[in-house]
A protein has these predicted regions:
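Terminal-region recognition feature
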Residues: 1-134
Length: 134
């Protein structure tokens, strides 16, 4: 997402907030956890999706979703996307829906909103008669 300048200050502040949230969502569980994945020779969920999809076709859904859990101190830890990358795009020119669980966020563990994102992608795939990859 490239930064833009708006004439209206309110639009600029909203755009800046969207840009900040987008950048935050792209980092998953943070730079340290991404480095740990790379040190093990593994790709992140986002990197796997980008490799799979035809260039420039992936549209992410639910990028800003966060979990609602409060037990075990989770009310103090929030990551945008809630540990799963979901969306659609093309593979070899064919529409597909994808989800990829992000180990950098809570070890890729399943929360209520995490599961809801996967179910939404499955429903969209069925509705549109397209395959799902997860």
């Amino acid at each position: 997402m490239t930064k833009r300048k708006h004439k209206e200050p309110i639009l600029q502040s909203r755009y800046d907030e969207l840009h900040r949230k987008n950048e935050e969502a792209l980092t998953g569980g943070g730079a340290k956890r991404i480095e740990q994945q790379h040190a093990k020779g593994k790709l992140t969920a986002r990197e796997r999706v980008q490799l799979l999809m035809d260039e420039g076709t992936f549209e992410e859904l639910g990028k800003f979703v966060m979990h609602r859990a409060t037990d075990f101190g989770l009310d103090k830890e929030h990551y945008l996307g809630d540990g799963v990358i979901t969306g659609y795009g093309k593979v070899n020119g064919r529409l597909v829906y994808v989800f990829s669980q992000d180990f950098t966020v809570f070890g890729g563990s399943l929360s209520e909103t995490h599961a809801e994102k996967i179910v939404k992608i499955m429903e969209l795939a069925m509705k549109n008669g397209a395959p799902i990859i997860g």
